[in-house]
Amino acid sequence: MKYREILLDQLKDLPYFNKKTIYQLSEQYGLKSATVDTYISRSLKRKDIIPLKNGCYVSADFFDKNKNDTSYLFFIANVLRAPSYISSWTALQYYNLATEIIRVTTSVTLKVTRTYQTKIGNFYYQSIQNELFTDFFLVKGEFDFFIASPAKALFDLLYFKTRRFGGLNVENVKLLISELRIDFNEMDKNEREKFFTMIKKYVSK
């Protein structure tokens, strides 16, 4: 077995990896960095590994086994831009509160706004200030991920869509929720109350 195949075999069970991981594995075989870079280029060309962002990859084998697992996609979204959490339309769909089919995985981050278009999906990150980077939690499973509560997911969606609820009152917000076809009444009562508490400082009565 050639060194490139040996390295691929060692990487195939990782949910993601970066160049540093590959270099560390290659040290045991005394491979030079230039040689490893050639292996990476060749593996990308042969589609044995899939680029996620600059210097970050997943093996095609691992992705094929997990591509239908939503938790894996959310896990990768958290990894690509940290700190971040799943929110907005993506979280609302996760909670079965949105009727629209969502093609982009949307997250909220403390870093600058950014989009990653990858072969495993498109990831969109919206930047928010520290004081609003709240009300999300960790979902544990085979792939752990951070996601907004239902109330915060709706807050984040409308916060960015309306530019911080500019000029809106509570009735305007209710109408907008209806127009967006969000199943607000299906949301837990405590979450609905929490949402109205969240928007109180931004909207008029």
Where are these regions (language model features)?
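Short gly/ser-rich loop at a beta-strand->alpha-helix junction or flexible surface loop bordering the NTP-binding
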Residues: P51-D61, L73-K119, Y125-Q129
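Short aromatic/basic micro-patch
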Residues: Y16, Y85, A148
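Short, surface-exposed acidic
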Residues: S33-T35, E100-R103, L168
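Hydrophobic alpha-helical interaction segments
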Residues: T134-K205
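Short beta-edge/loop segments at beta->alpha junctions of small alpha/beta modules
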Residues: M1-R81, K119, T134
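Hydrophobic/aromatic-lined pockets within catalytic cores
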Residues: E27, N96, Y159-R163
